[in-house]
Amino acid sequence: MYPPCSLYVSKHFNLSFRSNFHISIASVDEHNNPTVTPIGSLLLNDNQTGFYFEKYPKKLPIHAEGNPNVCVLGVNSSTLFWLKSLFKNKFKEYPGIKLYGQLGAKRKATEHETKRLQRRMKATKLLKGNAYLWCHMQYVRDISFTKAEKINLGDMTDHL
């Protein structure tokens, strides 16, 4: 599999965000119950790390205190991507990738990180909800990734 945050993985997560406007981060609570949190602000770096803006998640930061291990799932949900794949009975790229890693500490976002988020949200800049959701994002939480895993769908992904 590809190293976490390789060019291919970064491209896949960008496509996943474009088709879903979020990725999913799985964590476990204090009773070892799994839970999934949708995150719309995950950005990957090129050194097997990433970060997300932590304005809305409430449970994920609590889970990080007891168990910082997470699994990040990015799925390309583009209708055209899926229809082409179903028509041809094969995918040209993996439909999903999971990244395994650990959450770091919450910290103040840098100006560069804030600009990266603004660039990602540029397409929704003129919409009312953009200001509500994406303005005043001040804090990020780092994630260091240890492993990337492709999502296999039998014969449709065997050739990849």
Language-model regions, residue ranges each:
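Binding-site signature for planar aromatic cofactors or substrates
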Residues: M1-L160
